């Protein structure tokens, strides 16, 4: 789970 920017949820 990568969460760089508030909006990406991979």
Curated annotation (Swiss-Prot):
One of its GO terms (cellular component) is extracellular region. It is found in: Secreted. Its main location: secreted. The keyword Nucleus does not apply. InterPro entries: Adipokinetic_hormone_CS (IPR002047). The modification Tyrosine amide is found at residue 10. GO terms for biological process: neuropeptide signaling pathway. The modification Pyrrolidone carboxylic acid is found at residue 1. Keywords: Amidation, Hormone, Neuropeptide, Pyrrolidone carboxylic acid, Secreted. It comes from the Eukaryota. Belongs to the AKH/HRTH/RPCH family. Hypertrehalosaemic factors are neuropeptides that elevate the level of trehalose in the hemolymph (trehalose is the major carbohydrate in the hemolymph of insects). This is Hypertrehalosaemic factor. It comes from Tabanus atratus.
